[in-house]
């Protein structure tokens, strides 16, 4: 009789890599042109003045200035860059 148990295969043990989403530059901080402000899935935050939106809904600064978060009608959150 064999003294070893049969080695069962496991179906678990794998996970996807984290995508590092979220706010990268917070309110009242200075952003350079082209710097990423938010990485997101969908448009949780919408681009305001001087902010561009990438094809994966990443928001980035178009000019150098201070990041400003604001909520407008319908609970929409907008991010703008205020230039000095």
From Swiss-Prot:
SUPFAM superfamilies: Ribosomal L27 protein-like. InterPro entries: Ribosomal_bL27 (IPR001684), Ribosomal_bL27_CS (IPR018261). The lineage of its organism: Bacteria, Pseudomonadati, Pseudomonadota, Gammaproteobacteria, Candidatus Palibaumannia. Residues 1-21 are annotated as: Disordered. It holds the Pfam family Ribosomal_L27. It comes from Baumannia cicadellinicola subsp. Homalodisca coagulata. The keyword Coiled coil does not apply. It comes from the Bacteria. GO terms for cellular component: cytosolic large ribosomal subunit. One of its GO terms (molecular function) is structural constituent of ribosome. Belongs to the bacterial ribosomal protein bL27 family. This is Large ribosomal subunit protein bL27. One of its GO terms (biological process) is translation. Keywords: Ribonucleoprotein, Ribosomal protein.
């Amino acid at each position: 009789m064999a003294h070893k148990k049969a080695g069962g295969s496991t179906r678990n043990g794998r996970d996807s890599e984290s995508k590092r989403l979220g706010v990268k530059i917070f309110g009242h901080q200075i952003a350079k042109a082209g710097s990423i402000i938010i990485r997101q899935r969908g448009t949780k935050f919408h681009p305001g003045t001087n902010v561009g939106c990438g094809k994966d809904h990443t928001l980035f600064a178009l000019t150098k200035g201070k990041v400003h978060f604001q909520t407008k009608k319908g609970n929409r959150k907008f991010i703008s860059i205020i230039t000095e």
